[in-house]
A protein has these predicted regions:
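Membrane-integrated ABC transporters
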Residues: 1-39, 54-71, 85-89, 93, ...
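Cytoplasmic juxtamembrane "membrane-exit" helices immediately C-terminal to transmembrane segments
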Residues: 87-91, 95, 99, 162, ...
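Hydrophobic alpha-helical segments in the permease module
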Residues: 70-82, 175-182, 248-262, 268, ...
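An intracellular "coupling" helix at the cytosolic face of ABC transporter transmembrane type-1 domains
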Residues: 20, 113-114, 130-139, 143, ...
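Transmembrane helices of ABC transporter permease
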Residues: 20, 24-37, 41, 48, ...
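Cytosolic ends of transmembrane helices, especially the final helix of ABC transmembrane type-1 domains
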Residues: 222, 246, 263, 293-321
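ABC-type nucleotide-binding domain
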Residues: 330, 337-582
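Short intracellular "coupling" helices and adjacent cytoplasmic loop segments at the cytosolic face
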Residues: 1-5, 94, 102-126, 130-132, ...
Length: 582
């Protein structure tokens, strides 16, 4: 029952999106009616032609030519109607698919970071790409065959009744058995298609992970283990696909067997009727054609039901993404932070990603305007988490963080984040020109401003050596640029914006020592008068910080300037000395 309810709910959502194109749907149904009506008229014309051939006396060639001409005209009009119907069905299907993909991507852009962190990237990609494509295939099949199938059943029934009612009764009684068989099988294939979709998403996620981290895989000679893992996932996908296809493939032969029985019954009873004189040979020929056309849609509809089951499973996964709760909206009275002074305070902040595993327990922070605050500590101590809280990628569980005296939960996220310039250890560059990537935070920047920012970030030199300089097109994630060059472009992006507050999370980790010295000098100029948060593992980069926070297990265990902390001989001193040990 839960599966049936889920199917019903998903179907309603699909129909709701189809309703946006109701004019196309009406035109498709009308053209289907024209196509079916004309197709069903052909057997009558053929029957008349046959009766003209075998009628007593001479063959009526004129009548035969007339009927054949009618058949040619009717067939041509039917073909035109079918062609137009297919165009409309394709347009309607891919408009619905476009809308769903747009909805899914729009929702993805509004999801909280917690969702992105909790779900493999490949699984989400699979929902937006693979599942939508699978859904499109099933929906197109439904449009192209379901409408015409239903109309054909109704039309042939009317025509058969007009020819011979008793034989029609035999057809009507036997044929629906194929629908019961199809329904019986379809109910059992839903769970198999669902498992197939899950296995496909897992495989997509794994392949994407391996492609993105192939250097690490090869560096640690992990190829064999990954091949074994891929083979295991691939085997499960193969098994779930074969099971789904095996059971769904029973549908067509089973319905065809029933329809063959119907055809045989019509031929037998029709022959007796022809001998008895209650039907002409031409009429029997037309009836046999109708019986075949009547049973054919049952075969097609049974196939459509199977495909539609797969489409509904994919639609469920798409709608699950579309209906994910978005990031909590800004408060109705949230203010816009125009240009922050940069006074940041945290009061008794507590936060955890999972309720049973507290990370930050009671953190207090007081950063003055223009102060350079460095955050250090071992991996997993909460440094990046603190940055996430400052940017409101996550909200605190308890306590508060304020900027210029206003709780950041009462500031719009967009305006808060625009006041920060952020350079992360993980670089991100979009496909486009070098210039496009630099001006992301300031689209109206002049050429002089772009070049000045690049010179300050020491990226101008390598940019001018590229084939087309600032107009050089780079691929996704920087293409062939080195990691250091990509990092320099990200730094240039921030240099151009000149925001009042900065976050540098291992910003120079991918840059050689000589370039790092230039960058540190540029950063010193950039940070002048700007509140800055610097996350660093290389402690040599934070000697000039106004305040250093030493974190461990989510708590601040030491704070002070570099020389003070080294003189104390505590945890920071141990970290510092371990990095510079001979």
């Amino acid at each position: 029952m839960p599966k049936l309810k889920a199917n019903s709910s998903t179907l309603k959502k699909v129909l709701g999106r189809i309703a946006r194109y109701r004019l196309n749907a009406v035109l498709s149904i009308l053209l289907s009616a024209v196509y079916v009506g004309l197709s069903l008229y052909v057997p009558i014309l053929a029957g008349r032609a046959i009766d003209s051939i075998i009628a007593p006396g001479s063959v009526d060639y004129a009548q035969i030519m007339l009927e054949l001409t009618k058949i040619a005209v009717v067939a041509a009009i039917a073909a035109l109607a079918q062609w137009l119907m297919n165009i409309i069905n394709n347009s309607m299907t891919y408009n619905v698919v476009k809308d769903m993909r747009t909805e899914a991507f729009d929702r993805l852009m509004k999801l909280p970071l917690s969702y992105i962190d909790a779900h493999p990237y490949g699984e989400t990609v699979s929902r937006i790409i693979a599942d939508v494509d699978q859904f499109a295939d099933g929906l197109l099949l439904g449009f192209s065959q379901l409408f015409t199938g239903i109309l054909t059943i109704i039309g042939t029934l009317i025509f058969m009744l007009s020819v011979n009612a008793p034989i029609t009764l035999a057809v009507v009684i036997l044929t629906p058995l194929s629908l019961f068989v199809a329904r019986f099988i379809a109910r059992r294939t839903h769970s198999m298609f669902a498992r197939q979709g899950e296995d496909r998403a897992e495989q997509t996620a794994f392949v994407e992970e391996m492609i993105g981290n192939q250097k690490v895989v090869q560096a640690f000679a992990h190829e064999q283990a990954n091949e074994e893992r891929f083979d295991e996932i691939n085997k499960r996908l193969s098994e779930s696909s074969l099971q789904a296809i095996f059971y769904s493939s029973i549908t067509n032969p089973a319905t065809r067997f029933i329809n063959s029985l119907v055809y045989a019954a019509v031929g037998l009873t029709g022959a007796f009727a022809a001998v008895a004189g209650s039907i002409t040979v031409g009429g029997l020929s037309a009836f046999l054609s109708y019986a075949n056309q009547y049973t054919k849609p049952f075969n097609e509809i049974s196939g459509v039901i199977t495909e539609f089951q797969n489409a509904l499973v994919c639609a469920e996964r798409i709608f699950a993404l579309i209906e994910e709760p978005t990031e909590e909206p800004d408060a109705s009275d949230a203010c816009v932070l125009d240009h922050a002074e940069g006074i940041v305070r945290a009061n008794a902040v507590a936060f955890s990603y999972a309720a049973d595993r507290p990370l930050i327990k009671c953190l207090d922070l007081d950063v003055k305007s223009g102060e350079r605050m460095a955050i250090v500590g071992p991996t997993g101590c909460g440094k990046t988490t603190l940055i996430n809280l400052l940017m409101r990628f996550y909200d605190v569980n308890a306590g508060s963080i304020s900027v210029d005296g206003t709780d950041i939960r009462n500031i719009t996220r967009h305006s808060l984040r625009r006041n920060y310039g952020m350079v992360l250890q993980e670089t991100w560059l979009k496909e486009g020109t070098i210039r496009d990537n630099i001006v992301m935070g300031k689209p109206d920047a002049t050429e002089e401003e772009i070049i000045a920012a690049a010179k300050e970030a020491h990226s101008h030199g390598f940019i001018t050596r590229l084939p087309k300089g600032y107009d050089t097109v780079i691929g996704e994630d920087g293409g062939s640029l080195s990691q250091g060059q990509k990092q320099l472009l990200c730094i240039t992006r921030v240099m151009l914006c000149l925001p009042p507050m900065l976050i540098l999370d291992e910003a120079t980790s991918s840059i050689d020592t000589r370039t790092e010295q230039h960058i540190q000098h540029a950063f010193a100029q950039l940070m002048q008068g700007r509140t800055s948060f610097i996350v660093a593992h290389r402690l040599s980069t934070i000697k000039n910080a106004d305040m250093i926070l030493v974190m461990k297990d989510g708590d601040i265990i030491e704070k002070g300037k570099h020389d003070e902390l080294v003189a104390r001989g505590g945890f920071y001193a141990a970290l510092y000395n371990s990095q510079f040990a001979q």
